Amino acid sequence: MKGFFENLFRQNVRSVINTGKKVGARAAAREIINQEWGYPLANHEVLFLTNVYQPKHMKRHPFHIVRGTVAPLAVTLPLGFFVLNYFGVISSKLGLLIALSSFIGGLVIWTISIIFDSLYDQQHTYEVKRGLVMGMMMFIISEVMFFFSFFWSYFYISLSPNIAIGCVWPPYGLTVYSYMGLPLLNTVLLLLSGAILTDGYTILTEQKAVHEKNEKVLAVEEAFKNLMNLYKTKNSINTLTFVDERRDKFFGKESRQEDKIAEQKLIAISAGVKELRDLDWDLYFFENPENIEPNYKEPTNLSVIEYALITIYLKKRNKVIKTRLYFTLLCAVVFLACQGYEYFFAPFSMNDGIYGSLFFLLTGFHGFHVLVGSILIGIITIRFIVGNFNLLNVGTNFQIYKNKSTGFACTLFYWHFVDIVWIFLYIVIYWWGSR
Amino acid sequence: MEGEQLQTAPYNPRFPQQNQTKHCWANYVDYYGCVKHYNGDNSKCQTFFNSMNSLCPAAWISEWDEQKAADLFPSDRV
């Protein structure tokens, strides 16, 4: 399908070049299918192609008209089933198993379809991303309220302790955790992981360079940034002179005599970035049809050295960001393991008094949120490895609405929310609430 | 009947609310703490005893006495 829309798009470009104006999407579709498939399309088929599948450049508005999908039902119906099962209206183990698999499968399908809407259909425009980020913020605010209610119950109970627990907090005779042991390690783990993830995000969105005091690397970075600016401002005609200057810095002046050998070596390196280039640069212009001009020139005439510079830079950058993602995941897993250890060896239990109830309610829900955050970080790690956040997709500024890193940004917000809740938990339960 | 003075627990600013549960509990703890302090001599602890008896339901006192006997009462002071 993607190839079809590219052709459709190119047909439009051709039309702009030849006649100076765009043909309508439907006319273009008709034309292409006539040419390529050899038979004309019926009206309703054209309507289906142009209305149901709506690439960005074929719409007259920036919003995403979502397609019909079974995912929301597959997620919410099992939720209803869980409730009925909990109250004993329905009790069937097979039904529960089916509901659970439908719930998880629906979530997976929903996530993947949103990612595909963004990557292949190019539906995530500025406005759509703003809506997504706003939705995430609303969700986080609702989560804050959720935790606020539990903190309220904690303070209600602990500020004026009942006579049954000896009018003291923590309850008389109960052994509770010291704030200096595992909880402190957990605090360090969560805060460190948040900082590291933020660092990865700043590198991803190019707010921060990949640091290394190496002239070659700095030269490559600078060259790359300049190249990006040149391509993004569409003044790519004189890149070759610019690359010559960079080449001197990068390989030394004596290498000029060995240009041919160097270029042959670099052709090999550039092969690695070719796939990336084919995907990304097409997508860039595919995504920004307003950049198309009558003298539109496909950006395929990069020099070999430019490819090499980009390859080296991208490899280093990917490695650095990947390290940060892995480290964050590791921190999350160790945190969960520590919490599991603490739960397993707890001197109180959930049903032996008010302290245990509140402790497990608060830390348990927080632990569940850490688990969800870890899953989100896992998703963005996979997306990063697969290449969803490639450089041209991501953009070069901290503009969450203008780049393709919205998923990363939302995960980051969520992770920081989990961090902050933990800080309150640590201060209130482990520190203030201990002896 | 004429000579008998009826007296309830005096006002205590630590417990200004209508709910006097904790006031009762504090008097129970104070009474037995006082007895413990004077090595079983309860003659100086009558204020606490009177307040306790006028504030606390009898069932609570007997329950707490049982807890105290079984060493389960949630306080160090009794």
UniProtKB/Swiss-Prot annotation, chain A:
PROSITE patterns with a match to the protein in the record: COX3 (PS50253)
Keywords: Membrane, Mitochondrion, Mitochondrion inner membrane, Translocase, Transmembrane, Transmembrane helix
One Gene Ontology biological process: mitochondrial electron transport, cytochrome c to oxygen
Disulfide feature: none
Reaction(s) the record says it catalyses: 4 Fe(II)-[cytochrome c] + O2 + 8 H(+)(in) = 4 Fe(III)-[cytochrome c] + 2 H2O + 4 H(+)(out)
Main function: Component of the cytochrome c oxidase, the last enzyme in the mitochondrial electron transport chain which drives oxidative phosphorylation. The respiratory chain contains 3 multisubunit complexes succinate dehydrogenase (complex II, CII), ubiquinol-cytochrome c oxidoreductase (cytochrome b-c1 complex, complex III, CIII) and cytochrome c oxidase (complex IV, CIV), that cooperate to transfer electrons derived from NADH and succinate to molecular oxygen, creating an electrochemical gradient over the inner membrane that drives transmembrane transport and the ATP synthase.
Assembly, per entry: Component of the cytochrome c oxidase (complex IV, CIV), a multisubunit enzyme composed of a catalytic core of 3 subunits and several supernumerary subunits. The complex exists as a monomer or a dimer and forms supercomplexes (SCs) in the inner mitochondrial membrane with ubiquinol-cytochrome c oxidoreductase (cytochrome b-c1 complex, complex III, CIII).
Protein's name according to its UniProt entry: Cytochrome c oxidase subunit 3
UniProtKB/Swiss-Prot annotation, chain B:
Domain CHCH: residue ranges: 21-64
GO biological process: oxidative phosphorylation
Membrane-related topology note: Peripheral membrane protein
CDD domains: Cyt_c_Oxidase_VIb
Compartment list: Mitochondrion inner membrane
SS bond partners: 24-56, 34-45
Keyword presence, Magnesium: no
Name of one Pfam family that matches: COX6B
Associated pathway: Energy metabolism; oxidative phosphorylation
Protein name per UniProt: Probable cytochrome c oxidase subunit 6B
Species, as recorded: Dictyostelium discoideum
Species classification: Eukaryota, Amoebozoa, Evosea, Eumycetozoa, Dictyostelia
